[in-house]
Each structure stands twice: as C-alpha cells, then as structure tokens.
C-alpha cells in the first residue's frame, strides 16, 4: 500500500492551537476484518462516549511549530471494550500533549462486536497498528520524528496500547511498505493488562475475547506474557485503591518489563480509584517529566 494521501482523507481543519486540525479515516479503501468493509458510517456518539464504530478514525492535535518536540503519541481511550471514553480520556489528553509540544492522535477504534467485526479479538489491535503506520508514513507533514512515535491507553485502552507494544507483529495489517509498527514508547494509565482469571477485568475480557475463551487465547492476549527485551520503554500509573481494574495489572507488567531489562517507570497513588485522572488534574506532570527524557 502506498503512503496515505492525507489531502484525500481530511474531514475538516482548524488552525487554532489546541483544537483538532484533522480527522482522518484509518482506511482509504475497504476496512479489513469488517462485516461492513465498504461502509463509511459515523459512529454513535453521546455524552463524550462513542459506540458502534464502523469507520475508525484518527483525530489530530498538533503543537505550535515553535513548541514542537518531534514526539508523537497515539491515544487509545478506554471504556471496557464496550464504549470509548473519547472526550474525557482521548481529547482532553491530546490537548495537553499539544500544549507541551507533543503531537497527539486520538484513535476512534472499532469496539469488538461480532456484528461489526469478523474476528473481533484483533479488530482494535489492527486499528491501533494502522494508526502507528499512518503517523510514521506522514511524519514529515506533521513535524514528527519517525523514531519518537508512542502509544498510550487508558483502562481497556491500556490493554490495547500494551497489545500494540507487545504484539506489533501479531495482527493482519496491510504493510507492503514495510513501515515499522513497533511504538517507541508506551504510556499506560490504570490499564487492563492480563486476561488471566485471577487478575483480569472480566467485562473487558468478555467483550474482547467472548464468554469462554480457551487458555491459548487468554495467554495470547495477556500482554504481561508477551513482553520481551525488545518491548518499548513504558510509563505506568495506577491508583492502589482501584476497585475496577486491580493495580496488580500495572505491577505485574512493571515486573515483567524490569526482568527483561526494559526501561519502565511506575507511579502508584494510594487513593484515587479507577478513572482518577478526572479528580487529579495534575496527574500528567510526572508523565511529561518522563517523556521529556526520551
């Protein structure tokens, strides 16, 4: 596939800093692994939440040129693989990244539904890898360094982001150009990591893998088991009192990375619960300190 011609894919454009400059269709032709491969229907959106994504997109937030660092991050909002918390976790984070000189791309990925995706297990991963591909192939236009492209995810979106970081060679993405799909860094915020019975967020697992996945499938999508010495550096943050996604998800991922000599930083807050970013506005400050060192 030739690099995407963004001039054919731009939905709308603004020039104001902090506002999205473009919304881009992930696929210029048929959507792979879709029950509606030619459909371009908009997703259902209400109250900042997104449902029923048939046509996945990237929403682009670029920093002012005099602040641009060359770094970029693809953001995967959470929502238990049932909805996408698009505004609260996607757009809000993207604006902050742009203010700090980092290009941000909010991913509206396909939510795993049997009615919309042929093999729903890999649908979100295909979309996230395609997003990395698009950012790298169009890096020059956006002032991005191809060697500074990361992935970020919240909650179930953290599972998706960690899947990209550990399974970037494990999903069917049309990549005739040989574009590097490995992210250069990963940022995981109260992430779902494991699909194992003892640790998983059951609703996220059921929505992604179905009600009764076999052991091989559970192991394949337990991203702590997919870590190698080539896994990209990671920043994780979680609250110890998270009652929805056990903090041990972040801890086990941290330990696996550490034992593979992968640079990793973990911030655990004693209180905050799940979704603590909505109650602690300064949560990104240590993240920016970390990312500035990359």
Region roles according to the model:
Residues 1-23, 294:
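Bacterial Sec-dependent N-terminal signal peptides
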Residues 21-67:
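N-terminal cap/lid segment of alpha/beta-hydrolase-fold proteins
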Residues 44-45, 191-226, 232:
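Mobile cap/lid helix-loop segments that gate and shape the active-site cleft of serine hydrolases
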Residues 69-78:
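Short beta-strand element of the alpha/beta-hydrolase
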Residues 85-86, 90-93, 107-146, 278, ...:
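Catalytic nucleophile-loop/oxyanion-hole region of alpha/beta-hydrolase
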Residues 130-200, 218-219, 223:
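Primarily recognizes the serine-hydrolase "nucleophile elbow" in alpha/beta-hydrolase
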Residues 235-238, 242:
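Short beta-strand/loop motif that positions the catalytic acidic residue
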Residues 247-294:
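C-terminal catalytic histidine-bearing segment of alpha/beta-hydrolase fold enzymes
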């Amino acid at each position: 596939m030739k690099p995407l011609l963004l001039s054919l894919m731009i939905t709308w454009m603004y020039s104001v800093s902090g506002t999205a400059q473009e919304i881009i269709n992930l696929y210029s032709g048929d959507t792979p692994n879709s029950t509606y491969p030619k459909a371009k229907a908009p997703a259902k959106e209400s109250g900042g939440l997104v449902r029923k994504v048939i046509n996945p997109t990237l929403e682009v937030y670029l920093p002012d040129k005099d602040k641009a660092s060359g770094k970029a991050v693809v953001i995967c909002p959470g929502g238990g693989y049932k909805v996408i918390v698009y505004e609260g976790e996607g757009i809000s984070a993207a604006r902050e990244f742009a203010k700090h000189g980092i290009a941000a791309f909010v991913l509206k990925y396909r939510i795993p539904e049997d009615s919309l995706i042929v093999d729903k297990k890999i649908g979100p991963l295909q979309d996230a890898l395609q997003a990395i591909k698009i950012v790298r192939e169009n890096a020059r236009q956006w002032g991005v360094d191809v060697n500074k492209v990361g992935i970020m995810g919240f909650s179930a979106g953290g599972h998706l982001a960690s899947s990209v970081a550990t399974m970037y060679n494990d999903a069917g993405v049309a990549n005739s150009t040989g574009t590097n799909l490995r992210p250069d860094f990963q940022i995981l915020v109260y992430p779902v990591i494991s699909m194992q019975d003892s640790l998983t967020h059951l609703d996220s697992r059921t929505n992604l893998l179905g009600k009764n996945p076999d052991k091989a499938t559970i192991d394949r999508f337990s991203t702590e088991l997919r870590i190698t010495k080539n896994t990209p550096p990671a920043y994780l943050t979680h609250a110890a009192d998270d009652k929805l996604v056990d903090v041990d998800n972040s801890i086990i991922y941290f330990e696996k990375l550490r034992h593979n000599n992968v640079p990793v930083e973990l911030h655990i807050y004693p209180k905050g619960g799940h979704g603590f970013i909505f109650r602690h506005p300064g949560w990104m400050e240590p993240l920016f300190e970390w990312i500035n060192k990359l």
